[in-house]
């Protein structure tokens, strides 16, 4: 029975066609998560060659970031669509680590002016209480919201309904 269960469990495992992973530490080396992400990025890039996208905050705006290699060609049509239709300002390129996976850096600052509406929506839909938040809650929340919006914009523009997609926020 154990072999049968294992067979069916493995048989039903799905491999995603695309992976999106977001973290404050994508192209932004500030702590331990950076090491975890950058170490496994090479392995994931080998398996999913340019079908894994890391999403990070564009905290280096206007400054040279040695961890980010910007590209004008990667996802250029979607980048234009994201700005014009979804009001998302992104920079796209490669993470300067082994494997050089595709990176989307998003400017999350514009969402601060919509913060109260976003928090209201989160409370009404999911009962996420932001009233008692402290520390860097707002900054982390606005980045998380922006990263989710990136995937929400990218998916229908670039992928198909039959594509299996995983979104892993950190």
Predicted regions and their residues:
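Catalytic cores of nucleotide-sugar-dependent glycosyltransferases that transfer UDP/GDP/TDP-activated
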Residues: 6-170
């Amino acid at each position: 029975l154990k072999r049968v269960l294992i067979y069916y469990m493995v048989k039903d495992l799905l491999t995603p066609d695309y992976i999106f992973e977001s973290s404050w530490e994508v192209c932004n080396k500030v702590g331990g998560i950076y090491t975890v992400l950058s170490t496994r990025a090479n392995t994931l890039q080998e398996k999913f060659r340019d079908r894994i996208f890391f999403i990070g905050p564009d905290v280096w705006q206007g400054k040279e970031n040695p961890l980010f290699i910007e590209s004008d060609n990667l996802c250029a049509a979607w980048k234009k669509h994201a700005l014009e239709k979804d009001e998302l300002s992104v920079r796209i390129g490669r993470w300067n680590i082994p494997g050089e996976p595709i990176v989307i850096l998003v400017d999350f600052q514009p969402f601060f002016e919509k913060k109260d509406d976003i928090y209201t929506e989160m409370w009404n839909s999911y009962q996420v209480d932001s009233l008692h938040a402290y520390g860097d809650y707002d900054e982390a929340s606005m980045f998380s919201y922006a990263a989710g919006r990136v995937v929400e914009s990218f998916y229908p523009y670039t992928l198909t309904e039959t594509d299996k997609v995983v979104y892993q926020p950190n």
